């Protein structure tokens, strides 16, 4: 089609993003289709949308449920990008490609013909706690430790300290990653060996891991526990990469899963609102909770796949099924690797989409299916809760 033009290479870094932006500055288009082929942060898509200022449609792709590494993670990239754009008053169209070619072709044609865009922002402002001046008295006063700063382009992890205190009854203690690394290096080797022996009872395959890296990972668990006691903390939001790999030499997923088991909620990417969400669930139901990504969906049975690298507490596994894992990005332990056990669940998130604090709450049920991807995951039926 002579009316369609575009770039023929992936946007993977600063150089390629500038090249793509310059192309569309020179070649004027009425509308833009962005292929979210894999997971990325939202820096480029936000900057691109602001500069080009044209209607945007983002396409995400299904993820083959191989039981192995999560390779595309396209849907998660779509979620992150949409959140960032909506937060900045930009509401793009989006399409999740499925096997029904007629369906997504029709969606694309509708986007192409439509004269309207970015006119839905009011729909995202309706569900908010913006007018609620009172804190949640039913939730006990809590204190969350933020270790490190959230990665660039992860706008979902933003927070307002005053708002968290006034509306959610949470105080904040900021710490550096070096605080955690220093504390973890001081852990007695005997304590590390005792913990390694204990987790071997629940996790298969510990002997197959690099023992030095495994012990480093266990030391992070003890480091978190010592910091928790020192500062009287109830939850953590931790910058889990890349420094955990590159500077300390292990993954933090397993240690954080162990803290989650103790109902000390731990969220990756220094996601403060994510950790607060888990903490509130812990208080309400007295059981461990888990922060997850939505990485795949099936519109035929209205189900989604909840996943994270290896962050799920051991009690969420069926007895005898839990194994150790190594992180797919850096090949380092410790991760939990198992499917989430079947049963009814509460899905809850404190969110700040469209710059308004709000609660997302829905019921779900984990299905009795095999692990969709390495790490910890579950296929969750949403029943008639959504359409």
What do the predicted segments below correspond to?
Residues 1-146, 150-235:
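Metallocofactor- and cofactor-centric catalytic cores in central/energy metabolism, strongly enriched
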Residues 37-38, 54-62, 67-68, 74-75, ...:
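Anaerobic metallocofactor- and corrinoid-dependent redox/one-carbon enzyme cores
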